[in-house]
């Protein structure tokens, strides 16, 4: 990398001395592009040399193995060890060849990514820079076109690297891969104060996860509302049972039987004592005749029936007794509307999610 930078320095100095109208940012961008292109060319040359040497060795080993297989049987016993060693070498070289092909594919992918990033940097710089003259405008409107110099033709001889020594040839491809430079704070534009290009990745699974979470919350809410309604119905049932249960005094009266002087006839004393006890316990009704008491009881029964008719749910037809408060009856009626609102809300949320997903797919 340093050698390539040293080679490109005279070119950059000559371009700056020629009196061009490029801004400092465009000069830095051009310098970075030249450095990247020179690095890619040198790497391709090294890989081509290594592939050629491996092919030559493979060819030599194939010829040697074919000669050893075509020899007479008299010499087979003496050269068995050599044949086995040659076959082992052939298999090892084949493995190395496959490894090199994988590394070549990796480097080509890295070069493609590097080229896209450099083209994006050039486009951003051209959009941000203000045109100073017509020449600068024409230069900014030009798109970065990929050259076929080092793919179809031999590279420039003035830019070639010197021949490597035998010790340097044994370097692995991992030492020259671009992945080693990925841990730095900035990528290629770091030494030249260029902006780092951020890769925007779409996350289509985010909408699916959000929809799943909303569905789960809706199910939990629906279950909680259902449990609340069941608890309220149980509470109303208990209230009705408590209201219908007689008071302890009335229960004692029904249990207590009148005294019998004879097994068949009741005594007047027992009846009079019962009436006195009843009148002493119900002091509020001492001055009212029995007919008036019967009328009051009938009116209460009619009022309870009217209240029961008034407390009939218009949605499900459930009836509530007079002992149930009006607030409980109102909450039961409101529950029907809350359930309908929840269903509408869930349907609208699902429609919005599908609409969001369709827009996201269309924009992509």
From Swiss-Prot:
Any one of the GO CC terms: perikaryon
CDD domains membership: Zn-C2H2_spn-F
Biological process (GO), any one: oocyte microtubule cytoskeleton polarization
Residue numbers spanned by region Disordered: 1-26, 56-75
Disruption phenotype: Mutant females produce a ventralized eggshell. A fraction of eggs are fertilized and the resulting embryos have a variety of pattern abnormalities. In mutant ovaries, grk RNA is mislocalized during mid-oogenesis and grk protein levels are reduced. Defects in microtubule organization around the oocyte nucleus. Bristles are considerably shorter and thicker than normal and have an altered morphology and growth direction. Actin bundles are poorly oriented in mutant bristles.
Bias (Low complexity) ranges: 9-26
Post-translational modification: Phosphorylated by IKKepsilon. Phosphorylation is required for spn-F neuronal distribution and dendrite pruning and reduces spn-F homooligomerization. It does not lead to spn-F degradation.
Location(s), subcellular: Cytoplasm, Cytoskeleton; Cytoplasm; Cell projection, Axon; Cell projection, Dendrite
Zinc fingers (UBZ1-type), renumbered ranges: 310-336
Name of the protein described by the UniProt record: Protein spindle-F
Organism of this sequence: Drosophila melanogaster (Fruit fly)
């Amino acid at each position: 990398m340093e050698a390539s930078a040293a080679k490109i320095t005279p070119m950059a100095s000559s371009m700056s001395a020629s009196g061009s109208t490029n801004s400092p940012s465009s000069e830095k961008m051009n310098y970075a592009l030249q450095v990247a292109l020179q690095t890619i060319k040198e790497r391709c040359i090294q890989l081509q040399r290594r592939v050629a040497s491996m092919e030559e060795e493979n060819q030599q080993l194939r010829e040697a193995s074919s000669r050893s297989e075509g020899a007479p049987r008299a010499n087979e016993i003496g050269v068995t060890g050599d044949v086995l060693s040659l076959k082992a070498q052939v298999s090892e070289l084949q493995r190395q060849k496959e490894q090199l092909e994988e590394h070549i594919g990796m480097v080509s992918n890295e070069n493609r990514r590097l080229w896209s990033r450099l083209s994006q940097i050039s486009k951003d710089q051209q959009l941000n820079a203000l045109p100073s003259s017509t020449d600068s405008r024409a230069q900014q409107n030009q798109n970065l076109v990929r050259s076929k110099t080092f793919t179809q033709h031999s590279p420039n001889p003035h830019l070639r690297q010197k021949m490597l020594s035998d010790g340097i040839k044994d370097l692995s491809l991992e030492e020259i891969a671009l992945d080693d430079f990925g841990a730095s704070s900035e990528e290629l534009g770091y030494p030249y104060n260029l902006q780092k290009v951020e890769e925007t990745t779409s996350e289509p699974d985010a909408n699916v996860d959000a929809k799943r979470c909303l569905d789960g919350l809706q199910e939990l809410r629906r279950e909680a509302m259902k449990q609340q309604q069941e608890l309220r119905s149980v509470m109303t049932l208990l209230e009705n049972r408590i209201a219908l249960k007689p008071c302890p005094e009335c229960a004692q009266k029904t249990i207590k039987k009148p005294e019998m002087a004879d097994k068949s006839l009741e005594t007047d004393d027992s009846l009079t004592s019962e009436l006195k006890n009843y009148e002493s316990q119900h002091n509020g009704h001492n001055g009212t005749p029995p007919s008036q008491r019967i009328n009051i009881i009938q009116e209460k029964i009619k009022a309870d029936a009217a209240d029961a008719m008034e407390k009939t749910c218009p949605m499900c037809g459930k009836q509530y007794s007079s002992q149930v408060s009006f607030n409980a009856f109102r909450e039961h009626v409101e529950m029907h509307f809350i359930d309908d609102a929840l269903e509408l809300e869930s349907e609208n949320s699902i429609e919005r999610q599908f609409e969001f997903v369709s827009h996201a797919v269309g924009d992509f």
